[in-house]
Regions:
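Short, low-complexity cationic-aromatic patches
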Residues: 27, 39, 97-101, 115-126, ...
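A short, N-terminal "cap"/entry segment at the start of jelly-roll beta-barrel domains
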Residues: 2-101, 183-243, 346-349
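Conserved metal-binding segment of the jelly-roll/cupin
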Residues: 112, 145-166, 173-176, 292-315, ...
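C-terminal functional regions that serve as terminal interaction/effector modules
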Residues: 6-8, 12-67, 78, 260-349
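Conserved short histidine dyad/triad with adjacent acidic residue
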Residues: 83-95, 104-122, 240-260, 307
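Hydrophobic alpha-helical segments and helix pairs
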Residues: 161-198
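A short beta-strand-loop-beta hairpin characteristic of the jelly-roll/cupin
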Residues: 112, 116-148, 265-297
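Intrinsic, low-complexity N-terminal interaction/targeting segments
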Residues: 98, 103-108, 117, 126-127, ...
Length: 349
C-alpha cells in the first residue's frame, strides 16, 4: 500500500493554494483497502453562484418572505371535531407539508362535547392554549385535566388524545415543519409535559399590570417559561409564549425580532384594537407606511421576522393576546436580535 507524499512549497510547508492542483499520483487501488467497485463523482447536484447572486436569497425574493396574514374565528366556530391548520405553505414555497411559518404550524383544534381527537405529531415542542371548553388529555397513558385559559406543553415523542366534556376550542402550535425541513424524527424529550393553569397565569399578569409604571414598558405581559430552559428562559427549547394585556386607551411601542410571531387574540372589543407593522421607523420612532391588522377576538395573525410592530387600544376595555414564536430556538442560536425603540443603540431605518 503506497501513500503519495503531500505537496510541499519551496519553504517545506504544505502548499494550500487552491489554484494549484494536487500533483499527479498513482491510481488508488481500492482493493488494497478491502473495497470493490469504482469511484463516483457526486457532482450532479453541485451548483456555483457568484456571491452577489446568492448571498441574500430572502432580500432578492428568491426565497419567499413570511406574509402578514389574518385568520378569523369563523374558520373553527361551530365546526365539527377536527383540526383547522393555518396553512401558508404555498406562499412560503414549502412543498412537503403544512406550515404557518418556516419552522412552525399553528392550528385551531375543535372538539365537540363528548368527542375526542388524536393530536400525535412529529415535533419536539407542542403548545396548546384552551380558548374555551374543558375536558382531559391522555398523554402517554397519563391523564391531565384542561379548561378555558390553560396552557399545555408536550415534548418530543408524546402520544396525545384530547377528550372534551364541553364544546372546546384550542390554539395549537408545534415545530413539525422544522423537523420536516431537517429530515429529523423527534425522539428525545427536552422537557417534561407541563401545564400552566389559567388561574396562575392570570394572577401573575394582574400582579404585573398593577405595578407602578407598568404601562411605561414595551409590553405588559407574562413570559411563560420551563425550568429546563435555563438559558433561553422560554416555554420550550424551541417555542416562546407571552400572555399579555393591552390596557384600555394605551399604546405599546414598536419593537422587532427575528423570530416569527403567530399571534392569538383573545377578548378584544369588536373595533379599536389593532397592530401596526412596517419595516422602518421615522426619527420619532414611529412606524413608516404601516400595515394595519385589526384585532378579532378568537382570531390569529402572523408577524413576519424583522418587522417593527406596535399595538394600540383606542377603547375603554382591555384586550388580551398570546403571541407564540420560535424564539426559543432563535435565542439558543443567538440570532433573535430583539430591538426596542427606546434602546440607545437603535439605528432608525
Amino acid at each position: 500500500m503506497s501513500i503519495a507524499n503531500p505537496p510541499h512549497s519551496a519553504a517545506g510547508s504544505v502548499n494550500l493554494d487552491p489554484t494549484i492542483p494536487a500533483p499527479m499520483a498513482n491510481a488508488t487501488n481500492v482493493a488494497e483497502y478491502g473495497f470493490e467497485g469504482r469511484f463516483v463523482d457526486w457532482a450532479d447536484d453541485a451548483r456555483y453562484f457568484e456571491y452577489s447572486k446568492a448571498a441574500n436569497p430572502i432580500g432578492s425574493g428568491h426565497a419567499p418572505q413570511v406574509p402578514i396574514r389574518q385568520f378569523g374565528p369563523d374558520i373553527y366556530t361551530d365546526q365539527p371535531t377536527g383540526i383547522v391548520p393555518l396553512d401558508l405553505s404555498r406562499e412560503l414555497g414549502i412543498n412537503n407539508g403544512e406550515a404557518t411559518s418556516p419552522a412552525l404550524l399553528a392550528s385551531f383544534v375543535r372538539i365537540r362535547a363528548g368527542e375526542q381527537i388524536d393530536t400525535a405529531v412529529n415535533a419536539t415542542s407542542q403548545l396548546y392554549y384552551v380558548l374555551y371548553g374543558r375536558g382531559f388529555a391522555a398523554v402517554d397513558g397519563r391523564l391531565v385535566k384542561f379548561e378555558k385559559g390553560d396552557f399545555l406543553t408536550l415534548p418530543a415523542g408524546a402520544r396525545s388524545v384530547f377528550y372534551a366534556d364541553a364544546e372546546t376550542a384550542m390554539y395549537w402550535v408545534h415545530d413539525a415543519p422544522l423537523l420536516r425541513y431537517l429530515g429529523a424524527e423527534a425522539r428525545e424529550p427536552r422537557f417534561r409535559a407541563t401545564k400552566f393553569a389559567r388561574a396562575d397565569a392570570v394572577a401573575k399578569l394582574e400582579d404585573i399590570a398593577n405595578r407602578p409604571g407598568a404601562n411605561d414598558k414595551s409590553r405588559v405581559s407574562v413570559l411563560l417559561a420551563n425550568e429546563n430552559q435555563e438559558q433561553s428562559l422560554t416555554i420550550t427549547h424551541v417555542l416562546w409564549a407571552m400572555f399579555g394585556v393591552l390596557p384600555a386607551a394605551q399604546e405599546q411601542r414598536p419593537h422587532r425580532h427575528q423570530s416569527v410571531a403567530l399571534d392569538l387574540i383573545l377578548d378584544a372589543p369588536p373595533s379599536g384594537c389593532y397592530t401596526l407593522l412596517g419595516t422602518r421607523l421615522d426619527e420619532r420612532g414611529e412606524i413608516v407606511d404601516p400595515i394595519r391588522v385589526d384585532w378579532q377576538a378568537g382570531g390569529a395573525f402572523t408577524t413576519p421576522p424583522g418587522m417593527w410592530h406596535a399595538h394600540y387600544n383606542e377603547t375603554d376595555t382591555p384586550a388580551h393576546l398570546i403571541p407564540i414564536q420560535d424564539a426559543g430556538l432563535q435565542t439558543y442560536l443567538r440570532s433573535l436580535d430583539i430591538k426596542f425603540t427606546q434602546r440607545r443603540d437603535l439605528v432608525v431605518g
